[in-house]
Regions:
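Short, acidic, metal-binding catalytic loop of nucleotide-sugar glycosyltransferases
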Residues: 1-5
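Residues at the starts of beta-strands that form the adenosine-phosphate
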Residues: 6-8, 175
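Conserved alpha/beta core of the MobA/IspD/sugar-nucleotide pyrophosphorylase nucleotidyltransferase superfamily
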Residues: 131-205
C-alpha cells in the first residue's frame, strides 16, 4: 500500500518463504544463511538492487502499518540526505514493556538523533519507577553508504552486549535519525507474542 509493488523485495534464506513468494507473485531475493541480523541481509540485497536508500521492514513485525512506511519516505525527502540511517520509535504505555528485556528502548536528543538504545529500562530514575519511555519500532531506512560501513565491520562492543544491531552504526560514528511511528505494530520476539498478533488480527476482522 505504501510503495509500488515492483519496489518491494522479500529477502530470505528460507526456501519455504521463497515458495510462498512465488505462489503469490512477490519478488524475493535469496540471501545467505550466514546473515546474523536483518541489516546484514539488507547489505546483501544492496549489492544486487541499486538504490539510494533501502527501507527495511523486519519479518517479525507482521502488523507494521503502511502509513509508517510513508512516514519514513517523507522524512527521507524532508532531510534531503542529511542522515544515512533512520529508525522508527513510539512511546511506551505499559510498565511491562518498559522493563521487558525483549524490547529495545531508545533515548534521543532534541533533533531526534539517537543517543543510545538498550534492552535495559532507559531512562531510569533512583526509585526505579516507570515514568516515560520510548521503544524501537523495527522500520528502518539505510543509505547505500551506511550499509557499506556496516558490512565491513564485525559486531561492535555494545552491539554484542545488547544484541541490537543499530548500535553498530552509533559506535562507528553514523548518526541515526529517529522517526515517530504508530503503536499498532506488535514485534514477535518470543513465542507468546504470536498470540498477541493473532488476537490483534482477529479484532481487525
Amino acid at each position: 500500500k505504501a510503495v509500488p509493488k515492483d519496489s518491494i523485495y522479500v529477502a530470505t534464506e528460507d526456501n519455504r518463504i521463497a515458495d510462498h513468494c512465488k505462489k503469490h507473485n512477490i519478488q524475493f531475493i535469496m540471501t545467505s544463511d550466514e546473515c546474523l541480523t536483518g541489516t546484514d541481509r539488507i547489505c546483501e540485497v544492496s549489492k544486487l538492487v541499486e538504490a539510494d536508500y533501502y527501507i527495511n521492514i523486519q519479518g517479525d513485525e507482521p502488523l507494521f502499518n503502511p502509513v509508517d512506511i510513508q512516514s519514513l519516505i517523507q522524512e527521507l525527502s524532508k532531510q534531503k540526505n542529511l542522515y544515512d540511517v533512520y529508525c522508527g520509535y513510539c512511546s511506551i504505555d505499559s510498565e511491562d514493556t518498559f522493563y521487558s528485556l525483549n524490547m529495545p528502548k531508545v533515548i534521543f536528543n532534541k533533533r531526534k538523533e539517537l543517543i543510545y538504545m538498550s534492552r535495559a529500562p532507559i531512562p531510569s530514575n533512583k526509585n526505579n519507577k516507570f515514568k516515560k519511555g520510548y521503544r524501537q519500532v523495527c522500520g528502518y531506512a539505510f543509505s547505500k553508504k551506511s550499509l557499506e560501513i556496516f558490512d565491513i565491520k564485525s559486531k561492535t562492543y555494545f552491539e554484542s552486549i545488547e544484541d541490537i544491531e543499530l548500535l553498530r552504526f552509533l559506535e562507528l560514528g553514523v548518526k541515526v535519525k529517529m522517526v515517530e511511528m504508530s503503536k499498532k505494530s506488535i514485534p514477535v520476539d518470543v513465542r507468546e507474542d504470536i498470540k498477541k498478533v493473532l488476537f490483534a488480527l482477529d479484532n481487525v476482522k
